Design a protein with these regions (language model features):
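Weak global preference for isoleucine
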Residues: 9-11, 23, 31, 43, ...
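General N-terminal targeting signals
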Residues: 23, 48-50, 87
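Alpha-helical interaction segments
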Residues: 19, 34-35, 51-53, 77-78
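Charge-rich, solvent-exposed alpha-helical interaction surfaces
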Residues: 9, 13, 17, 76-83, ...
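Intrinsically disordered, low-complexity regulatory segments enriched in Ser/Thr/Pro
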Residues: 39-75
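Negatively charged, low-complexity tracts enriched in Asp/Glu with abundant Ser/Thr
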Residues: 1-38, 62-70
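Generic detector of intrinsically disordered, low-complexity segments in short proteins
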Residues: 33, 87-88
Length: 89
């Protein structure tokens, strides 16, 4: 995974489950989850702690349904993708 950005990791991880599209606009940045072209949820993340002196960054991921209700919050990109996969089974 080295050299990959979080959005690319999420998009690749969810292939075949749900379409994941990066929304990158001024003041907007998240992964929109779509089925048949319709938005069915989203994943967004925020840096909660960082210390560049020791190269440490903690990121928290939110998975929300189409009504923007939180389904899961995880501190690991693979775990949040697993929550999305379970939700759309």
């Amino acid at each position: 995974m080295e050299g990959q950005t979080l959005d690319k990791i999420i998009i690749e991880n969810l292939k075949g489950v749900v379409e994941a599209v990066l929304i990158d606009e001024p003041k907007k940045f998240w992964i929109e989850l779509r089925q048949n072209g319709e938005m069915v949820g989203r994943i967004w993340w925020d840096v909660t702690e960082f210390d560049f002196s020791i190269d440490y960054i903690k990121v928290v991921f939110w998975f929300e349904d189409k009504d923007y209700k939180t389904v899961a919050v995880r501190a690991d990109v693979d775990e949040i993708c697993e929550e999305v996969k379970k939700y759309f089974k």
